[in-house]
Amino acid sequence: MDVKETEEQRQMRRIAFVAVVVSTAAVIASVVTLPMLYNYVQSFQSHLMVETDYCKARSRDMWLEMTALQAGKGMGHRMKRAWLFGQWIPETSAGGGGSGNGGGNYGSGASTGGGANTAGYGGYGAAVNAEPAAVCCTCNQGAAGPPGPEGPPGNDGKDGRNGNDGKNGRDAEVLPAPASEPCIICPTGAPGPMGAMGPKGPPGPKGSPGEPPQDGKSGDDGMAGQPGPIGRPGRDGMKGAPGAAGRLIPVPGPQGAPGKPGPIGPPGPKGNPGPDGQSYQGPPGPPGDSGTPGHEGRAGPNGPAGPPGDNGEKGDCGHCPPPRTPPGY
């Protein structure tokens, strides 16, 4: 039974197809867009960190230049013993005289700003700090160390404040009761279209054994078949009676083939003795097996000292950020 497709079914099919296409396009767009957005945010964060480090480095350089200018003018200034942005301030630099210019502060001043190593005469003694090893990097800092251990979890935060009460709803309205429609008795409608075939049901119970069948009747004789293949030959017949005696008719024939060789004759008499043989020197024989190894000899004297080895690899500044130079350099 053919089921005709209605207009509503065709419209629902179009809507379902459009919904599937739109959802598939949205999933593909999200799969492509999210990694690109994440990559952009990560690159922007890296660029922002580089710019922040550059600003910190410029600020540090400005402070160092200001300190050097104050030290060059001979102004007594009491500086705090501390680290500047996590960087070491060498005491032998031009700005190190801050701890030695003022005689009444920490130590006696020096012409090169190295007064931190001399004893003061008006107040406290000079601050004794170990000089760091000389570095070749312009950033004056080493590579980043390994990450530290994970810290303990923080305390739970305080509960938030209760939210504001919601607005009052609208007042209810008294609606009239819906008008009752008159009861209409409709006639029985036409049967609907035949539904799809349902799934196969479970197997039924086993039936009782049937009655024994009756013997069938013999069929009619069939048609004659094709002739069979040729049979095998029969056994040999009995031996016949002997024939008549033959007659000898002498006729000269051809010469026959030579006969077989006769047996070996008896050995002949012993011959005369031959002359004496001559001796020749044979080739040298193969070398003999190797003997057992001898005892280990005494240890020899120590050799002279070898030449000095090559110098080790020099440090590099691969961990330093690229310099930020103004346009035109």
Curated annotation (Swiss-Prot):
Assigned GO CC terms: collagen trimer
Alphabetical keyword list: Collagen, Cuticle, Disulfide bond, Repeat
An annotated Gene Ontology molecular function: structural constituent of cuticle
InterPro entries assigned to the protein according to its UniProt record, in alphabetical order: Col_cuticle_N, Collagen
Pfam families in alphabetical order: Col_cuticle_N (PF01484), Collagen (PF01391)
Region (Disordered): 146-329
Region (Triple-helical region): 142-171, 189-212, 216-248, 253-279, 282-320
Chain intervals with Basic and acidic residues compositional bias: 156-173
Biased composition (Low complexity): 187-199, 273-282
Biased segments, Pro residues type: 200-212, 251-272, 320-329
Family as reported in the entry's similarity comment: Belongs to the cuticular collagen family.
Summary of the function given for this chain in its UniProt record: Nematode cuticles are composed largely of collagen-like proteins. The cuticle functions both as an exoskeleton and as a barrier to protect the worm from its environment.
Subunit structure: Collagen polypeptide chains are complexed within the cuticle by disulfide bonds and other types of covalent cross-links.
Protein name: Cuticle collagen 6
Lineage, top ranks: Eukaryota, Metazoa, Ecdysozoa, Nematoda, Chromadorea
